[in-house]
Amino acid sequence: MTQAALAMSITATDPVDTATDARLKECIDSACQRVAPLWPLKHFVAVNPFLGFTGQSFAATAATFERVVRTRILMPRAFYRQALDDGRIDDAALARALDIHPSVGLGVEQLKQQARATAAPSSPPAVVATVAEVLDRLAEGDRYVSLVAFMIDEISAFCAGYFDEGQASWPSPVRSLKPYAAWRRLAAYDRNPEVMGLTGFRNAIAELPADPVQAIGLIITRLGIPERAVEDYLVRALFDIGGWSAYARYIGWSAERDGQRDDTLVELLAIRLAWGYALFQARTDAAFKIAWAQAMEEAAKLPDDQRLDDTPELAVDLVLHEAYEIAIRNQLIARLAGHGTGAAVARLPARPPVQAAFCIDVRSEIFRRALETAYPEAETIGFAGFFGFPIEYVPIGHTRGGAQCPVLLKPAFIVCEAVKDADDVEQAEVLGLRLLRRRAAKAWKSFKVSAVSSFSFVETAGLGFAAKIATDSAGVTRPVPSPVVDGLDPEIAARVMPRLAPGELGGRVTGFNDVQRVAMAEAALKAMSLTGPFARLVLLAGHGSTTVNNPHASGLDCGACGGHTGEANARVAAAVLNDPRVRDGLRAKGIDIPADCWFLGALHDTTTDAVTVFDEDDVPAALAQDLARLKARLADAARLARLERSALLGIPDKSAVDAAVIARSRDWSQVRPEWGLAGNCAFIAAPRSFTRGLDLGGRAFLHSYEAERDDGHRTLELIMTAPMVVANWINLQYFGSTVNNAAFGSGNKVLHNIVGQLGVLEGNAGDLRVGLPWQSVHDGTRLVHEPVRLNVFIAAPESAMDEIMQRQPGVRDLVVNGWVMLHSLGDHGTTIRRCVSPGVWIAA
């Protein structure tokens, strides 16, 4: 094709119908579904960054990201080469990986040669280019500010002001409008683009339709996007501003959970495309038109993502990654299959003195093992840390609270905070004082940061903060008060507890009635496989973390509690299960809790491994010695757990581990107060006897499950559709943040700046960052997290899991498309088989 013909092809391309074109709307909806949501910092939870791609295979997704998003979801070739050289990938793993990807057409030795060769830089055979990208290519080598970067900065600046949740001193004047309309209103006065050489920017935006969908359709037509490339072009545009797209998707996700519809992401897509359209209109030169026509011609020849031979370098890397995972999986399977269970079972009495239920979080695996060492007679249990109580917990002085349940669920009940043993007068006094202190703190902050008073404030009051800076630096005080106790006197904070009695708050019903309590208690106990015998003390230990100066602090708290600590859920569950009327109701349902059994709510601090037991004064006097023994054993277990974690934390002096770990939790310069869930690679749903005594290194989610107690496999279905999926989200967030932190992580923690109280920027500009900081997966010299997809092991009949996968297409997609590796555990874990697809199981 001649250059003239190429230039003319922009107008010759068949136009895509705009406002009434159902196909366009399908493309928009489909593109928006590709974006994974990003929860705000106040309840930051792990999300699978590939959530919108689980309907296709892992390999196809790798090809899609290279071709459409122009980024990788695998490690660099050098990583696999090093693993080969270190012996972490053996020939057997390579051969198995080649069997999975036969289209690569290589033998083991050929693959090793390819791995050790320097991969030639290559691009996929057909890509989806954007206007800004084409313009940047044309300007390569010039002293030139990237238009892609400029566009992202400008959109990010608008979003930061528009979505602000209270950080900005001056709220956006267009907040009342929808995003697209608000942006167009501001764009009419914005001269920044024209200063950058984008002539006619404001006119180009003004001529676009006011409706975002119509604007998208018009832009697609004017740009001449081939019909088969429309959806990919929209996906590419959304991933150009992936962080803000993810936050907009969160807004939509929240609306969908409440049965509503929200088009914030569509509006943001229109803004992004409008920028491209303005760039397109500003360039009328032949060089650009020819380059754009070539890009559209290439986009019209999009390949099938399944044809990995179109991208041979990617195919080699996929096989190498598969082999890397197989080698790690084989080691894990060998350890599980070779672990004896008889001795562990024999040590447990028929009625253990203590049963301690912990969250399935991988950090609990270390503590459970430590507690079983310190207290061999104790039985530990693994269950999602919300303990089956999906509540919205409303602190004193608030009208709304946080969702204390997995983000896949919607809170079913509202529980308000109250002061124990306080009458109505004292409750009102506490509420009024807290509100007064918060208003005063807000006014003081406004005075400190306002444009007029900030300079005089530093001059007159700066020295007064010297002592505070010193004590904060020494870890004696916190730079910012904990929101849990902010505005409360210490003696009042110690008396705060959840109020279970039915009530009303702002027109909403709060608390539980007796029928609801019995139903929730029954469901929780059955899901934990805890229906008897019951110990004298049953500990329900939620978990949270203690850090300072950490924007992602909630990401270290309990994901099953929606990015909050598990304290509220543990205390609510314990209070319900101690209720005599609830026990009467449970007895009628076949669950008999003895009179001498008491449930305790507790909180495991994953940063320090300290365990706090709540409501001790309610424990019957007859159990005082039992409680004292339990607390002593918990303290022993904490020391053992800290000692085990000290190596990874880089604490060389074993005699000073306790002090060093606690100091990290108070150090505002510490970028790695703990390792979170780094290293996670397995999810095991089985009786504890399958794994008791086995050191899994804090890498496995452990969920207690006894198939023989599960009538109709209802609990199994709950496990596979909720905890297993949440573990998959966590695993793939760590995976993405490791393989490509620039795209799926949040970069360097040291450079983070909070924006709008909802997320972080790396530096003072650029896109909103998603995922985990680099310091969460890397210790400065090596990776701490191994990028491995989740290996799931369930002690249940394969036929039952097959039926669940047939009923649950989302779970089936995860298994069949290789996002999790599902295995069955038979014969006490000595027989392990992997699921290829429902009904097809092979030897692992």
Swiss-Prot record:
It is a peripheral membrane protein. Keywords: Cell inner membrane, Cell membrane, Membrane, Metal-binding, Transport, Zinc. Forms a complex with DabB. The lineage of its organism: Bacteria, Pseudomonadati, Pseudomonadota, Alphaproteobacteria, Hyphomicrobiales. The keyword Methyltransferase does not apply. The keyword Nucleotide-binding does not apply. It comes from Bradyrhizobium sp. (strain BTAi1 / ATCC BAA-1182). Zn(2+) binds at residues 359, 361, 543, 558. This is Probable inorganic carbon transporter subunit DabA 1.
